[in-house]
């Protein structure tokens, strides 16, 4: 997989290309990265790529021509079709399912905005999709781009040492993950649940599923509304709801 970022701050991506599982996978050649600086495509000696907005208003707007040239340069680096994504609070929310879809693609180009935004004509002519990482504003698209990259890359075969880790993460099954424990057996008066030390894999799997459903019901009930539960999950969830009704009565 080739991922390119159109950014005026290429060095920011060192954290994902050099460190952790994504850095290791990059060194192993499982995925490749290139930062494309649109300043190199500016039509002025000083490398300006922004200007004041028509109609007035605060801040500066990134200009379409240098960004378009940077995107076209990025596309030319691969013979495979590229999907151009603009990281924007106006985009559709990034979900696990979207990350799964993007992990199947051979070439992604991530457009990282700065200042007050990007000329709308560039978005209409050169961007395939806008994606948001949440309903809040950050200073630029670089951090959202790296969050998207991490979410996508961990789903690419070979990036994680054990793909089961990705399969069991929160959201991969549509519900939140269960609690996890390791040594010591007791910490500040809190002991590891007995069932996890029982060696009974059936009971452990049942406990973990129940804890996942409890946590999802408490913290993200909206996820349960979107999910079609299998009979085993419905049975456990009904048990949890019955317990809650008894406590409230």
Curated annotation (Swiss-Prot):
Out of the domains of life, which is the source? Bacteria
Q: What is this protein called?
A: tRNA (guanine-N(1)-)-methyltransferase
Provide the protein's localization: Cytoplasm
Query: What this chain does, per the record?
Result: Specifically methylates guanosine-37 in various tRNAs.
Q: What's the gene?
A: trmD
What species does this protein belong to?
Answer: Neisseria meningitidis serogroup C / serotype 2a (strain ATCC 700532 / DSM 15464 / FAM18)
Q: Which top class of enzyme applies to this chain? A: transferase
What is any one of the record's Gene Ontology cellular component terms?
A: cytosol
GO biological process per UniProt: tRNA N1-guanine methylation
Q: Which family does it belong to?
A: Belongs to the RNA methyltransferase TrmD family.
């Amino acid at each position: 997989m080739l991922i390119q970022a159109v950014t005026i701050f290429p060095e920011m991506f060192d954290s994902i290309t050099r460190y952790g599982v994504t850095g290791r996978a990059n060194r192993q050649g499982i995925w490749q990265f290139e930062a494309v600086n649109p300043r190199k495509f500016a039509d002025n000696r000083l490398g300006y790529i922004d200007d004041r907005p028509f109609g007035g208003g605060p801040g500066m707007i990134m200009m379409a021509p240098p960004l378009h040239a940077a995107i076209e340069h990025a596309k030319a680096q691969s013979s495979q079709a590229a999907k151009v994504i603009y990281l924007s609070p106006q985009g559709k929310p990034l979900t696990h399912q979207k990350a799964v879809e993007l992990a199947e693609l051979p070439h992604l180009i991530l457009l990282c905005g700065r200042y007050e935004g990007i000329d709308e004509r560039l978005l209409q002519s050169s961007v395939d999709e806008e994606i948001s990482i949440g309903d809040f504003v950050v200073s630029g698209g670089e951090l959202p781009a790296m969050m998207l990259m991490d979410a996508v890359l961990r789903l690419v075969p070979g990036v994680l040492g054990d793909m089961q880790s990705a399969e069991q993460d929160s959201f991969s099954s549509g519900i939140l993950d269960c609690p996890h424990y390791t040594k010591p057996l007791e910490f500040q008066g809190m002991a590891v649940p007995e069932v996890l030390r029982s060696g009974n894999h059936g009971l452990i799997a049942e406990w973990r599923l129940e804890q996942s459903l409890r946590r999802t019901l408490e913290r993200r009930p909206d996820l349960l509304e979107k999910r079609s539960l299998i009979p085993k999950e419905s049975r456990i969830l009904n048990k949890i709801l019955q317990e809650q009704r008894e406590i409230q009565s």
